[in-house]
């Protein structure tokens, strides 16, 4: 593997000194870029794009050709794991992801097998190794998975949900069934993420997109507990250096202290959290990633630059901050505004790293 030329993202996650605050964007390879739309059209549909390792590599690299980003993130989807379990993932226009065979009974859960990441998910591993090779050491490659709770919401509900009624019913009426599902998912994610590291991922992120839908006690029981299990099972060293792990629970600002106790290296923050407050609460234990509202990228460029400055000042001096959005970039954002955002982070953050 080529020597890493820009490692400030990895260094910041480990709270080592950096020259400027590193920056990348969730969903940086996505529909706001015209070149992404062209490649997706070439693939035919979203999952065909994910399953073609050469095209997945191409869209991963596209934002790095445009912008001075400090990390690349594997182009894939969190639902690859349940798809590999045989649920029959498909996408309906305007409806989002759906499953032909939801896992909404204990009998269905018992029948689930843990997928082999080098077999059923081999296309993801081929994408990881291809991207790592093509990056040629330019920036680190982030691998990722959904959290067990978040994956389970889609599996039990049969797709996206606004109320999570079915899975919450299972949580409170049949908790043993849900724990069985979450346990299988945690085991699957451990294998999946470790295989990503073996194929070249240099950092890992666990996306708990729907943890914020849970009550205080239910979050610990049904979400955090299983992310803890994953972290305990991960490969934490590769290529002679630590593989940092970031946990991101959208809507999880209440639980930062508990999340920081898991042994992760960093916490992702959504835009509802004050980053200065987050640093006071957990900055002695973990690095922080975030956390500009993605909708701010619709603002005039001077307003974007102002908000970048506000968040940098909120975090303050020293390392341990990776700048990002508080969630994925929206599809209708002007690519020039995204570029201005990235430039502003690098330009304005120098003063905080002396």
Swiss-Prot record:
The record marks 77 as: Transition state stabilizer. Its EC number is 4.1.1.37. One of its GO terms (biological process) is protoporphyrinogen IX biosynthetic process from glutamate. Belongs to the uroporphyrinogen decarboxylase family. Pathway: Porphyrin-containing compound metabolism; protoporphyrin-IX biosynthesis; coproporphyrinogen-III from 5-aminolevulinate: step 4/4. This is Uroporphyrinogen decarboxylase. Substrate binds at residues 27-31, 77, 154, 209, 327. One of its GO terms (cellular component) is cytosol. Signal peptide: none annotated. Its main location: cytoplasm. It comes from Shewanella baltica (strain OS223). Keywords: Cytoplasm, Decarboxylase, Lyase, Porphyrin biosynthesis. One of its GO terms (molecular function) is uroporphyrinogen decarboxylase activity. InterPro entries: UROD/MetE-like_sf (IPR038071), Uroporphyrinogen_deCO2ase_HemE (IPR006361), Uroporphyrinogen_deCOase (IPR000257). Homodimer. It catalyses: uroporphyrinogen III + 4 H(+) = coproporphyrinogen III + 4 CO2. It comes from the Bacteria. Catalyzes the decarboxylation of four acetate groups of uroporphyrinogen-III to yield coproporphyrinogen-III. It is found in: Cytoplasm.
């Amino acid at each position: 593997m080529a020597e890493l030329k820009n490692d400030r993202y990895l260094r910041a996650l480990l709270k080592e000194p950096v020259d400027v605050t590193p920056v990348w964007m969730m969903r940086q390879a996505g529909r706001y870029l015209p070149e992404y739309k062209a490649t997706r059209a070439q693939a035919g549909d979203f999952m065909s794009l994910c399953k073609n390792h050469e095209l997945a590599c191409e869209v991963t690299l596209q934002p790095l050709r445009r912008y001075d980003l400090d990390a690349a993130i594997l182009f894939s989807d969190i639902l690859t794991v349940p798809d590999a379990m045989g649920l029959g993932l498909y996408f309906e226009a305007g409806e989002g992801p759906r499953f032909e065979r939801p896992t909404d009974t204990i009998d269905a859960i018992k029948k689930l097998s843990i997928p082999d990441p080098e077999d059923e998910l081999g296309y993801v591993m081929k994408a990881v190794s291809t991207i790592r090779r093509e990056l040629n050491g330019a920036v680190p490659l982030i691998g990722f998975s959904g959290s067990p709770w978040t994956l389970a919401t889609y599996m039990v509900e049969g797709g996206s949900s606004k109320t999570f009624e079915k899975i919450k019913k299972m949580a409170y009426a049949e908790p043993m069934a849900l724990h069985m599902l979450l346990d299988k998912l945690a085991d699957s994610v451990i294998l999946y993420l470790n295989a990503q590291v073996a194929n070249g991922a240099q950092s890992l992120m666990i996306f708990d997109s729907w943890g914020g839908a849970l009550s205080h006690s239910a979050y610990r029981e049904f979400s955090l507990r299983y992310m803890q299990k994953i972290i305990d099972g991960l490969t934490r060293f590769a290529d002679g250096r630590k593989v940092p792990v970031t946990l991101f629970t959208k809507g999880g600002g209440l639980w930062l202290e508990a999340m920081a106790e898991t042994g992760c290296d960093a916490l992702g923050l959504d835009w509802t959290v004050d980053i200065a407050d987050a640093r006071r609460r957990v900055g002695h234990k973990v690095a922080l990633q975030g956390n500009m509202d993605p909708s701010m990228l619709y603002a005039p460029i001077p307003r974007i630059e102002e908000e970048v400055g506000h968040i940098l000042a909120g975090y303050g001096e020293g390392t341990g901050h990776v700048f990002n959005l508080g969630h994925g970039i929206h599809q209708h954002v002007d690519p020039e505004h995204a570029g201005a955002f990235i430039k502003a982070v690098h330009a304005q953050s120098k003063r905080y790293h002396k």
